[in-house]
Amino acid sequence: MTVISDTRTRDEILPDKIPVSGWRWRSFRPAEMGCRHCAQTFHWPAFMDALQGARDQIGRPFQILSAHRCSLHNALVGGAPLSQHLRLAVDISLHGHDPGVLYEALRQARFTGFGFYTTFIHADMGPARQWFGTRKARTQWQQD
């Protein structure tokens, strides 16, 4: 069994010096879309256009819990080996949002992969598929 650890502090792994040249998505900052571990970014304009479109449709901010991940960060958080987060995917907090409205806005914005959890929704543009993080999440989402 391989154990991966990282002893860097948050200030060391999240520098505020991510270039913003060409950044056109007013509701999101490059830092929140980059890897929380090393600040690596993956620039995918079509994905960001769709995310901005979903945000515009909802008309309220939403919190990105996780977006791009480097392979080490993905392993540290227990992500799937071929996770869409290795390119670009988002986990969006459900706090303050109607889950059904958020899902519908993301679906209409051309997201195709959805993971349903009790406190967040995962959205990506990989192969079309859906899953529930837990039995409790399945019950929660099927009631909405």
In which residue ranges do the predicted regions lie?
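Catalytic cores and adjacent binding grooves of peptidoglycan-active enzymes
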Residues: 2-7, 81-144
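Solvent-exposed, flexible loop/coil residues
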Residues: 22, 72, 77-81, 118
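Compositionally biased, low-complexity repeat tracts
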Residues: 18, 30, 74, 109-111
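Extended, low-complexity, intrinsically disordered C-terminal regulatory tails
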Residues: 48-78
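Extracytoplasmic cell-surface/polysaccharide-interacting catalytic and binding patches
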Residues: 1-57, 127, 138-144
